[in-house]
Amino acid sequence: MMRDRLASLIVVKQEGGSNTSISHHQATAIKCEASLYTESSLFQEINNNSCYRQNLNAPTHQQSHTSHLQHAQQHQTHQQHPLLPPPLPTLPLIYPCRNLFPDGCDINHLACCSSSNSNSNCNSDSNSTSSSPGNSHFFANGNTCAAALTPAPPATEPRKIKPLGAGKLKVGKTDSNSDSNSNCDSRAAAAASTSATSATSATTLAATAAATAAAAEAGGAASAAAAAKISQVRLTNQATTSMLLLQPNSSFSSLSPFDNFSTQTASTTTTTSASAAGHHQHHNHLLHQQHHNQQQQQQQQQQQQQQQQQQQEHLQQQHQQQLVSPQQHLLKSETLLSHEEDQLISNLTDSSVVSHSELFSDLFFPSDSNNSLLSPTTSGYPDNPAEDLTSSIENLTKLTCLRDKRLSSIPEQQLSSEQEQQLCLLSLRSSSDPAIALHAQQQQQQQQQQQQQQQQHQQQQQHLQLQLISPIGGPLSCGSSLPSFQETYSLKYNSSSGSSPQQASSSSTAAPTPTDQVLTLKMDEDCFPPLSGGWSASPPAPSQLQQLHTLQSQAQMSHPNSSNNSSNNAGNSHNNSGGYNYHGHFNAINASANLSPSSSASSLYEYNGVSAADNFYGQQQQQQQQSYQQHNYNSHNGERYSLPTFPTISELAAATAAVEAAAAATVGGPPPVRRASLPVQRTVSPAGSTAQSPKLAKITLNQRHSHAHAHALQLNSAPNSAASSPASADLQAGRLLQAPSQLCAVCGDTAACQHYGVRTCEGCKGFFKRTVQKGSKYVCLADKNCPVDKRRRNRCQFCRFQKCLVVGMVKEVVRTDSLKGRRGRLPSKPKSPQESPPSPPISLITALVRSHVDTTPDPSCLDYSHYEEQSMSEADKVQQFYQLLTSSVDVIKQFAEKIPGYFDLLPEDQELLFQSASLELFVLRLAYRARIDDTKLIFCNGTVLHRTQCLRSFGEWLNDIMEFSRSLHNLEIDISAFACLCALTLITERHGLREPKKVEQLQMKIIGSLRDHVTYNAEAQKKQHYFSRLLGKLPELRSLSVQGLQRIFYLKLEDLVPAPALIENMFVTTLPF
C-alpha cells in the first residue's frame, strides 16, 4: 500500500508588538548570527543531476571561539538589563518543508525557549508513537531562547494532541519565561497541532527531525540558527508568531526523486547539523574532533554514492546523447527560467543577508535541480508585516510555478513490484539511519540495473527484428505474412531526426538505431504547422505504428500510457479544472493522464486560472497558449502536433458514390477501370490528361530538423470533371483519340515529329523526299482532287504530292543525292560526271492519262470563229466536215504515238491499227467532250460549232454520236478510265496484223491497268459492273465507226467536194471488201 506524500509550504510571520525598540542584547544576537554565517564557508550548490557540497568540515574552531565570545557578551548584556522582556523574532521567515504524513504536519521549525539564565537548558522532545525510535534529545546552552509555538505543559503531564485537518492554518502563540533555571520542554507534536495520524511522525526524513529537534532545544536563537544555518533574525518584543501551511492533496503513485535525494543525504545532513549544534553548545574540542571524523566518513560515503550515481548516469548516457537537440532547446528555456527565478529571488531575499540552509534545501529540492531556490531566507524589513506576508506568498507562488517547470522533467520512478514498494517504505522509515538508507539505495540501484539489463536484452531482440528491411525501404511487419502499412505506403514516409515524447517514452522497449532515421509521414509539398518535437532516434515499435495509423483518422489524438513506457516519459501534464493547482516541485502523475508532447524535455506547468496580477507567469502561459492556438494545438488535451488525416469512411463513401454516378452518366461505354492505390508512377496519355489522378507523395530518405513541417492529406470527394468529357467517353469506349497536333498533316496518321517544316508521318516524309530527290512527275487520272488518307494515300501520287506542298512541306530542305549522308557539308571534291540512272518506268495508266491530256484542247484556247455562221453553202459545209475530220485524225495520231509500247509494234501494224481505229477515236473523243444539255460540239483541233451547223454534213450519224455520249456520261467515267478506254480502242486485234501477239500483250497490259484502277478507286468501287460496262463501249464504237464510213461514202457519191487523200485512204482501208 502506497503512502501519500504532501508538499507543504510553511510561512512563519512575526506580528509586531508594542515595543519596537531593539536592545543591545538583540543587536548582539543579530551580530553574533551574522558573523557566524558571514565567515562560514559551509554552503550548498545544487546542480541538475548531482549535489555538490563544499567544505564539509565546517564549522571551524575559529567560528566556535567567536560564537563562545558572542554568547558570553550576550549573557553579560542580559544581566545588565534583567527587566527587558525576552526578545522574539519579528522578521517574516519563509521555511519550505516537506510533510510526508498523510493527514497533517508534525514539524517544529525553530522552536526556541527564552530564559535570562546563562545556564538554562531547552529540551526539545519530539515524541512519536511509531515503532521507530521517536525520542531525540539535544541540549543547547544559550543566552536567549524563543518560547515554544504552543504553551508547554509540565513534564509529568501527558501530552495532548489536538487534531486538525491537513493543509489548514495553524497559529501558535509564544510565551515568555523569566525564570533563569526554567526548562522549556518543546513538544513538536503539540506545536504543529497535527491530526491524530501524526503518530507516524518518526518516519519523517532524518534531516527534518534533526533540524526540528536542534532548533527546539537550542539554548538561544543564535545557537539554533547556527545549527540549522538560519538567516539573520531581527528580534522585537511582545509579538506573536503565525504559521501558514499550504498543503494541496496530490497523490503520488511512485517514489519521487526527492526521496532518492533525501535517503542519500539524510545521514550527512543530520550528523553535520547535530555535530555543529553540539560543538557550539558545549565547546568541546573532543566532540569537534569526532565531528570532523564523522564528516570525513560522510565524505567517503558521499563519494561512493556519487560514483554509483555516475555509473547510473553512464548507463543512461546513450539515451541522453540522442536527445541533444531537445536538450539544446531546453537549455534556452532553462536559462530564461533561471533568469526569471533570480529576479523573483531578489525580491524575496536581501542581498546583504542572504544565506541558504543546507538542511531545508536538501529536504525541499531534489538532487538534480539546477539552482537553490526557495531556501529559508530573511527578506528585508518591511514596514507593514501584512503586506510583506502577501508579497512573500505571491513571490513564493510564482517561484513554485517556475520550479515545477524545471523539475517536471524528472522522471518518476515506477514501483513495478511489491518488493520495490517495501524497499521504498523501508528507505523512508529508516531514513534517520544513514547505513540503512545507503543499503536501501544500493538494493534499489541493483534492481534498476537488473531491469535495465532485461530491457537491453529486449531491445536487442527488437533491433534484430527491425533490421529486416523490405525491398521498398520500410521495415518488414513482424509476425505477419501481409505487407505492413509502411511497406504498402512507404512512399508517404521519410526520415526524421527530431525527438518526440512518444518515442522518448518508448525508448525502453524499442532498440536505438545509430543513424537516427525513422519512418514518419510526410505528404507532398509540406503544409503542416511546425512541430515542436519530432520522432526520437529509436524506431517505433510495431504496436506504436498500429496506434499511429489508427489514430490518424480521429479528430483528437490520445496516446495510451503503457506501463513499460511511463518510466521514461519526458514530459507529463494533465488538465486542470480551474484555478491554481499546485504540485509543489514535483511532477504529479494522475492515473488517467495522457502522454502529451512538449517542446522540451520538461513539461509545461499548465493551469486554467491566471490572475491579472500574475504578470510574469500569466503572460508567459498566455503567449504559449496563443502560439499553440496558431498551430491548431490544444494545450490541455496534450495535442501539440498534428499527423496527416487520412480519409474517413464517410469521405471514401462519398468519393465512391461520385465516381459511380459519373460512370452511370456515361452511356454506351464500359465502366471505367478503377485505379489501384499503389505507390507507382503512371504516364497519362494526352487524351486522358484531363482526368487528373491524385498526386502521389515522393519518398525522401533524409533527416528532418526539429521544426518539421507536414501537411494534412485531404481527399477531394468531388466527382471527376473529366468523366463526362468526350475524351473520357472515348477512353471508356476503348477508342484512344489523339490531339490534332500529334497527327500527320498529310494523311492523318500518327506523327512523331516535324519533317521538312510540317508534322508528318514517316511514310509521307519518305514519299516527299523521294519525289523531290528523283524529280518524279505524277499525273492524276481523276479530277486532281483524290482523297489522301491513311488508307488511300498510295493510290494517287500526284494528289499526295500536291497535298504535301499545300500543307507547307519545303522542297528546298530535302538534301540532294550529292549531299546525301553529309549533313550541313558540301562534298570536298566534285564527283565525276556520270549518266544518271534511268528513271523507273511510269505507270501505264499515268502515261495514258498524260497522252490524253496532251492531245485534248485547252478550254481557254478554243476557237469560236466558226460558231453559228449564217451564210454557208452546202459545199462549204461538206468542206468544213472534211477539214474537221482530217485535223482530228492528226491529233489522234499524236495520241497513238504517246501510248507506251506503240512504237514497239511493227510499222505496218502501227499503220493498220491507226487506220482502223482513227474514226472510232474521233467519235469517242467527240462524245466525251460533248454534253447533253449543251448545243456546242468541241472537236480535237479546238474548233467549236453549233449542233445545227453539223446536221448537213453529219446527217443521222450525229444523233447516234449524241446518244453514245449520253450513255458514256451515264457511266460517270473518270479521266483515267477514259484514257485506258481510248488506248484499248487503238490497241486491239485487227485483221491483217503481222504480230498480233505483241498487240495482244500490249492490250492485256492496258486492260490490267484499267482493272487496277477500277478495283482500287474509291469512286469506281461504288459503281456496279463498272469494268465490264467500260469494255462494253468498245463494240458500240465500232458500230458508230461503220456509220461514219457510210456517211463519208454518201458524201463522196454526191461529189460536191472531193475527199482528201487521208479520207480516201481511211475509206479504202476500212472497207470490208
UniProtKB/Swiss-Prot annotation:
DNA-binding region as annotated in the record: 741-816
Expression tissues: Ubiquitously expressed in preblastoderm embryos, specifically in central nervous system and intestinal tract. Highly expressed in third instar larval imaginal disks and brain complexes, but not in ovaries.
Keyword Zinc-finger on entry: yes
SMART domains: HOLI, ZnF_C4
Zinc finger regions, NR C4-type: 744-764, 780-804
UniProtKB keywords: Developmental protein, DNA-binding, Metal-binding, Nucleus, Receptor, Transcription, Transcription regulation, Zinc, Zinc-finger
Chain intervals with Low complexity compositional bias: 59-82, 175-185, 263-277, 292-326, 441-458, 495-514, 619-636
Region listing for Disordered, in residue ranges: 55-87, 150-185, 263-326, 437-458, 492-514, 529-579, 618-640, 819-841
BP GO terms, sorted: cellular response to corticotropin-releasing hormone stimulus; cuticle development; positive regulation of transcription by RNA polymerase II; regulation of adult chitin-containing cuticle pigmentation; regulation of transcription by RNA polymerase II
GO MF annotation list: core promoter sequence-specific DNA binding; DNA-binding transcription factor activity, RNA polymerase II-specific; nuclear glucocorticoid receptor binding; nuclear receptor activity; protein heterodimerization activity; RNA polymerase II cis-regulatory region sequence-specific DNA binding; RNA polymerase II transcription regulatory region sequence-specific DNA binding; sequence-specific DNA binding
Record GO cellular component, one term: cytoplasm
A Pfam family it matches: zf-C4
Ranges of residues in domain NR LBD: 840-1070
Basic residues biased stretches: 279-291
Location of the protein in the cell: Nucleus
Function: Binds to NGFI-B response elements. Plays an important role in late stages of epidermal metamorphosis.
Family: Belongs to the nuclear hormone receptor family. NR4 subfamily.
Subunit structure: Forms a heterodimer with USP.
Protein name per Swiss-Prot or TrEMBL: Probable nuclear hormone receptor HR38
Source organism: Drosophila melanogaster (Fruit fly)
The organism's taxonomic lineage, starting at the top: Eukaryota, Metazoa, Ecdysozoa, Arthropoda, Hexapoda
Gene: Hr38
